[in-house]
Amino acid sequence: MIPICPVVSFTYVPSRLGEDAKMATGNYFGFTHSGAAAAAAAAQYSQQPASGVAYSHPTTVASYTVHQAPVAAHTVTAAYAPAAATVAVARPAPVAVAAAATAAAYGGYPTAHTATDYGYTQRQQEAPPPPPPATTQNYQDSYSYVRSTAPAVAYDSKQYYQQPTATAAAVAAAAQPQPSVAETYYQTAPKAGYSQGATQYTQAQQARQVTAIKPATPSPATTTFSIYPVSSTVQPVAAAATVVPSYTQSATYSTTAVTYSGTSYSGYEAAVYSAASSYYQQQQQQQKQAAAAAAAAAATAAWTGTTFTKKTPFQNKQLKPKQPPKPPQIHYCDVCKISCAGPQTYKEHLEGQKHKKKEAALKASQNTSSSNNSTRGTQNQLRCELCDVSCTGADAYAAHIRGAKHQKVVKLHTKLGKPIPSTEPNVVSQATSSTAASASKPTASPSSIGASNCTLNTSSIATSSVKGLSTTGNSSLNSTSNTKVSAIPTNMAAKKTSTPKINFVGGNKLQSTGNKTEDLKGIDCVKNTPAASAVQIPEVKQDAGSEPVTPASLAALQSDVQPVGHDYVEEVRNDEGKVIRFHCKLCECSFNDPNAKEMHLKGRRHRLQYKKKVNPDLQVEVKPSIRARKIQEEKMRKQMQKEEYWRRREEEERWRMEIRRYEEDMYWRRMEEEQHHWDDRRRMPDGGYPHGPPGPLGLLGVRPGMPPQPQGPAPLRRPDSSDDRYVMTKHATIYPTEEELQAVQKIVSITERALKLVSDSLSEHEKSKNKEGDDKKEGGKDRALKGVLRVGVLAKGLLLRGDRNVNLVLLCSEKPSKSLLSRIAENLPKQLAVISPEKYDIKCAVSEAAIILNSCVEPKMQVTITLTSPIIREENMREGDVTSGMVKDPPDVLDRQKCLDALAALRHAKWFQARANGLQSCVIIIRILRDLCQRVPTWSDFPSWAMELLVEKAISSASSPQSPGDALRRVFECISSGIILKGSPGLLDPCEKDPFDTLATMTDQQREDITSSAQFALRLLAFRQIHKVLGMDPLPQMNQRFNIHNNRKRRRDSDGVDGFEAEGKKDKKDYDNF
């Protein structure tokens, strides 16, 4: 509930009342001097019922409600305080009665006073009252003293409390009512009260407070009081008579039933006391004479049942005080460190491009400052927290402090009263953002605070625990660049303290304080009282990334670089002899800032010119050039690309193997499903039609009595033949197991990583050896080992079960030599120990130009690493060139043919991955033929590269994709046609520029034997004997109808020999070669 506190205006005019009443009204601020005097005054006025002294209350209501008070003030003669509400206004009217009722709210004064007894001293600090009982009325009043548009004279702002039992003493005696004035006042004033019944109050509830008013001496001045609404929380009591305050007639007081939880403003009271002292001393004599009459009137009115108060005439016209000039508002932008003239200018600045760019740059610097600092070397940076800039050295920081920009910001912050951090520099570490302290800067929207003093928003703090926060009418923050000011958060009760951005509004000093205001300027805006729990104001903590600079470290930073070449900087003067600029003859530059002279002499540009032109022995720090930095970045990028290439290659190889297994599984699944389908069709009557043989069609093309079916048979894929089943079964038996594949992948991956480390080791060794040589020659030299590649069956994916040997090719930048081979063999075990804890056996085979690596863990794998170089093939291609023989080979160069074979293996692997890997059934047939070459001696002379070319050409030349059985039959048909015989076109190597026959290593007899064996295998395929060609047992027949044995007397194949070779006994001539 917020009761109304109206603006009361007093005009002192002559009246027809007696001199005693005039003296009673002389107590301008209502300070009661003694209870007897107040009672006498009350008794005096209570004995004049016909003279119209008291106001008459319109209606006496036992229960009424407190309404929200409007902001508008009312001009009346006296302040009316209902007895039930017991809320005493800050006595803006002369209150000469009810001294006993109001003495508990403030310090009492003696009855007799002299002229010097009314000096107002500081009131004794009161202790916090104890918590009230259950039947105690609680008052929570909060006063906010801001600049008003009406007041001309300040008044006492202390809060006074009127006890319920003392209200009866404030009732005036019978007086003649004047309803015109009374009704005007009570109709405009809100009716406040309680919602309780009338039975809860005693007889004192019927009484009303009497404000005895006596016409005063005519005065042309009009005093206007601006009383602002207060917040009161009133709890009803069971019986008002039970709460009795205890007080004494002394300068101090103590209450036991009233709990005061408001905020005391002693500084404001001091200003008001000084304003009221002059008028109080003038009315000293009148107050002495009115004290006895007021005490008598209060004593008499306490037992009088009248409800009339005395009416006091007042002037009809009120003089309006002159309003002070409105202070200008200053809008400040923390990001750009500038102030704007008005809100429109400030709004346009926030929407401008300059502000947005600075804000974006600030956010970007917070995200990338740590990475940028790490790339700029290890130079320490000194940071100015006020301007939020970083300087590269102590001289630059000192120049910034003396500069106009910094001084302008300091002046602006001092004017606005903002905290100014210390000018001591902070060293910013490399991992710390340059804007480390910007996180605590204001980010809230601007808001104007139209107050003439410093005001803290402490509404969220219990006012009972905060006392002694005093403010002055004109106090400011006097801050300089050397003074540290702690930031005061506006919301102290919140868990997360934040400082909002505000608009600082200048204050005006009170018109009535006179010279006292100058004495109060030294009082701080916020004070902590020892009696109450003070609000702890947190200090701004420094960022964790920045550390204060000690004098020793600052001196070390300053002594890092000594200025040179003072004599070469000359002063340029004007006609008057005043120095207008400085000119450096070494650098051919000019500057007009005296602070920049010292920095220029220490700068890198000036020192380089000094070293070039004056002293070549001067030491200048070397910074990498842009070209060198780009070269280094290019090397790093290429290294990352190589690592990414090898990683992707491993993933592709793993994916390729998984795809092959998946395709085989899908093939077998599809084959079994279709085989079951055709078996079911064969068992059905009527040729396998589920609905009987097709009969005559009906009128609509549908057989009578049958559901409609699509016209024409559904296109079915050709089912796998028996040859396909045999080929896929054989392929499954020769495909490597999972353990073998994992072992191969493991040893190959470890070997590749170890060779990479060996290459790095050899490169570092070469750099250290050639460190004293020329930089250009060193930069252009390549690494000794350029890379390692997979070749052979490993790269082509043609591994068979039981294969333990894989091949790798190690490319060198120069021709591989025996010394290089031995160095690699020596370093490889060390690098293998770093990568894997397993043991490996390493042998150096000089004749094979290779290093053989054997694993010691089952399954034992062997890796053959062959050294080669592209230079060998390039020389081989220009053998007819005259200059080819001028380049001499190393004396211990490895075998040339082995290196050429390794290069050819690289080309073969690349061709196979591009042409044969994606061809259907090609890889499967090549595995079948490799197995045939290992089982049958006749086929062992067939070169693997020629066989791969033949299979790829046979399958790719078919008109349609071939199934495994058909593909194997087509390959045997090609060989049987005599394509490998002498005089045939042959098989040319597609990886060679010159025509080269891949079958050149075979003799004529070997060619004929393989052709004859292929023709015999083709005949076996024609008679469903493919299992003999594949070297496997016959598969069980899926259809029992076709599993009928012939009982003719023929020689059985169960004599213990291979069927493929046993058949050869019939015709000794054809099968001697198997």
UniProtKB/Swiss-Prot annotation:
SUPFAM superfamilies, per the entry: beta-beta-alpha zinc fingers
This protein's record includes keyword Hydrolase: no
Name of the protein described by the UniProt record: Zinc finger RNA-binding protein
Low complexity: bias regions: 365-377, 429-448
Source organism, top-level taxon: Eukaryota
Residues modified to N6-acetyllysine: K509, K516
Phosphoserine: residues bearing it: S1054
Taxonomic source organism: Mus musculus
Entry function: Involved in postimplantation and gastrulation stages of development. Binds to DNA and RNA. Involved in the nucleocytoplasmic shuttling of STAU2.
Biased composition (Basic and acidic residues): 762-781, 1062-1074
Region (Disordered): 120-139, 349-377, 417-452, 703-723, 760-781, 1040-1074
UniProt note on tissues of expression: Expressed in Sertoli cells, spermatocytes, primary and growing oocytes and granulosa cells (at protein level). Expressed in testis, ovary and brain.
Subcellular location: Nucleus; Cytoplasm; Cytoplasmic granule; Chromosome
MF-aspect GO terms: DNA binding; RNA binding; zinc ion binding
Record text on subunit structure and interactions: Found in a cytoplasmic mRNP complex with STAU2. Does not interact with STAU1. Interacts with STAU2.
Pfam family, one: DZF_N
Alphabetic keyword roster: Acetylation, Chromosome, Cytoplasm, Developmental protein, DNA-binding, Isopeptide bond, Nucleus, Phosphoprotein, Repeat, RNA-binding, Ubl conjugation
Keyword Acetylation annotated: yes
